[in-house]
Amino acid sequence: MRAACPPPRKDRILNPQLAETLSVALLVLVLACAVIRPFGWPEAVVAVPAAALVIATGALSFDDALAEAERLGPVIGFLAAVLVLAQLCDDEGLFQACGAWMGRTAAGRPRRLLVQVFLAASVITAVLSLDATVVLLTPVVFATAARIGARPKPHVYACTHLSNTASLLLPVSNLTNLLAFTASGLSFTRFAALMALPWAAAIGVEYLVFRRFFATDLDAGAQAPASVEPPPLPLFALVTVGCTLVGFVLTSAVGIDPAWAALAGALALAVRALIRRRTTPLALVRAASVPFLAFVLALGIVVLAVVDNGLDDALGHLIPEGTGLAELLALAGLAAVLANVINNLPAVLVLLPLTAPSGPGAVLAVLIGVNIGPNLTYAGSLATLLWRRIVHAHDGEVELKEFTRLGVYAVPASLAVAVLALWLSLTVIGGG
């Protein structure tokens, strides 16, 4: 039985109805500005004042806001370390080497290039986060497709779909994962073990859909790339990433926050890059994307105000009890719908407190919904919006009708298969 809603606080400046209205209006404003980015402003320019306003008006108490900041602090630190790690890997030439490998092994065949893009995007998303795939791999895929004369659309679209779908595997793959990881109470290795089968199953469905949907583009002629000297393999970056992954497992096993492993990996690459003058302290700060980190924190506070002022009660009636297959499917479906309505980051912030009491299975079902669901619409995730800007910067076209039609084919199938795989994993491995 769910706890009853707490009585209205006495420290409110606004009555409950006005507090709810203000919180919802500010959330809509924050999300709209994050999508549109008026005047090129960072997302934090609107989100931070909005968070301050919900506190100042009493829509959310200062103590509750402080508690939310303390809860999100380690997650934000983890995210910063992973962003720096991904950028430094790019500085080391990891993504250029990946592009050379894709072009060489594709041998002028677009269908084979699609396989290579799926492999590269799946691994990069899982290990270095979806941001690395969107920001760093997408331009490389454009260049690789041009080099062999292939139509870029199937391969570039794969980057955005896999930045969402392939982010299911590890806690570091996506900010939503970090939040779910914290709420689930699972260790790093158990989280990965439970999500491995859903990750692989969803990617497999995506690949089959892409082969059929883009058949005409994939059958178009291409040519083998000219023989050129491949760039040197960035062994130091590869070894550092490998050691960081091992660090995630070891720190989780001994009860230490895995963020320390991410920090160690980022520091190792940063020190090397600074010594070799390949980066600067200012560039490292930019790589951490401080305005985006501030946006995440502010968004969490605004979302908490919305939840505390009535959304939790409204959604509570829609959350199914139990973690059977039907309940997991319902949770994932609800999460996917909510992600496309209000974006996946606020969706996971809203749903995690409501589903965490049901156990890790419910939390992971929500994660599947908020990660795969955004492939249906542009606004489902910030990564998709960023990908669209990158495509336009490379003179590519993204047609809303085509993007949505692809999502209609891919999302329901991959979502259902991933949830079924999660249910099997929970049955075999257990969620405790």
Where are these regions (language model features)?
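Hydrophobic mid-bilayer segments of alpha-helices in multi-pass membrane transport proteins
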Residues: 19-30, 39-60, 72-84, 136, ...
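Membrane-interface alpha-helices at helix entry/exit sites of multi-pass transporters
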Residues: 108-116, 146-159, 186-197, 359-368, ...
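Hydrophobic alpha-helical transmembrane segments in multi-pass integral membrane proteins
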Residues: 62-63, 175, 242-252, 298-316, ...
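Interfacial loop-to-helix junctions that mark the boundaries of transmembrane helices
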Residues: 14-19, 38-41, 64-75, 188-198, ...
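Long, contiguous bundles of hydrophobic transmembrane helices that form the permeation core
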Residues: 203-280
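Membrane-embedded alpha-helical segments and adjacent helix-loop junctions characteristic
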Residues: 62-153, 291-292, 297-359
